[in-house]
Structures are given as C-alpha cells and as structure tokens.
Amino acid sequence: MLFRSQHVKGPNLAPGGSYFEIARCLNFWQNSAIKNLSLQVEYNGGITKSYPINNAWLVGVDYFIHSKDFKNTLNLKALYKNIQEKDSDVPMQLTAVWAMNDLFGVKGLKFDGFADFWWETHAVDFREDGTCDTKKTVFITEPQLWYNVGQHFGCDNLSLGGEVELSNNFGSTGGFKCRPCLGVKWDF
C-alpha cells in the first residue's frame, strides 16, 4: 500500500503502526585475513498512521570488531539504500551496532544499541494547512542500559532498564528530539 497524502486530520486515538526489519550478514571466509568483513543484505518497511515507512532494500559491507571474550562487540556498516518511491541525494546508510556486557565489571549490566544515519528526502512537521517542511537526512540512535535483576533470584531472562532515543529528522518530526523510555525486558 502506498500513501499519497501524509496529512492526517483529527486526533489519533489509538496506538498504531508496524515496522519490520530483517538483516543478515553473510560471511563465507571466516578462516581468512578478511574474516571480520561480511556482506550484509537487509529489508525494512512499515506503516504508521502519521507517516509511511516505504519499503527499503539495503546491501553493503559490515565490519565486526570484538573483545577477546566477545563480551564487547561493535559492527560498522556501510550500506547502499534503495527506498521505494523516495529520492535521496546519497542512496546510502551508515550504521553502528554495539554491545558491552558486564559493563564496569558489574555482572549483568549491559549497554547496547545502534546508530543509523541515512539520506532521504522526506516531509516533516506537518501543519494544519497541509504544508510541511522537507529534510534530506535522518539520524537515529537508541542506546540502551539494562541490568539483569533476574540473576539474583533464578530468573536469568529478566532485566530492568531503558533506552534514550535521540533522533534528528526522524519519522514525521523535524529537528532534534530526545525520547527516554524505561522498560522491563524478557530475553528469549
């Protein structure tokens, strides 16, 4: 389904929206000098009440860095990004994904997250008269901090913590935004 109008009249009285992403790193040369370099393929897309998330196909390279015990990891990605029916000055996305387990030597304390930057010509800040602003880049990062409280009573899947979404020109909102969130997490 493609949306032609992005202006929504009336109150939004219900939660709405879906987003789907699948990404895979392909590496068939793990016993070589370039073992940390992988090919990545990815798809993302979705729908919300206030703005579309057009189908996007990404392909590129992923470079994997880790500590000797794999408790700390970092993936750096440079991806070609094709967004259906969208213009882009540079059809590319740069991504970093990290995880730090047992942070500061505290068993069960985890700091992880991602940061994405890409070029996409898109509408933001819709006004009552139907006009809006246009932006050409998007940045979003969601660093998370979790503590495994379940380890203290035999339930290793349970963590408490949260994240802070920091974004610039993300979704239908122009400019910089900070959105903190507390959470309870169950690891499957």
For every predicted segment, state its role.
Residues F3, L26-S38, I65-L74, N101-F111, ...:
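Short loop/turn motifs that connect adjacent beta-strands in outer-membrane beta-barrel proteins
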Residues N54-P143, Y147:
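Detector for outer-membrane/organellar transmembrane beta-barrel domains
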Residues F3, I22-R24, V61, W98, ...:
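Membrane-embedded beta-strands that build the outer-membrane beta-barrel scaffold
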Residues M1-T48, L58, E142-Q144:
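Transmembrane beta-barrel domains of Gram-negative outer membranes and organellar outer membranes
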Residues W146-F170, W186-D187:
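Long, ordered, amphipathic alpha-helical scaffolds
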Residues L13-Y19, I34, S50-A56, D87-P91, ...:
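Transmembrane beta-barrel outer-membrane domains
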Residues F176-F188:
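Outer-membrane beta-barrel "beta-signal"
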Residues S5-K9, V41-K49, I65, A78-Q84, ...:
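Transmembrane beta-strands of outer-membrane beta-barrel pores
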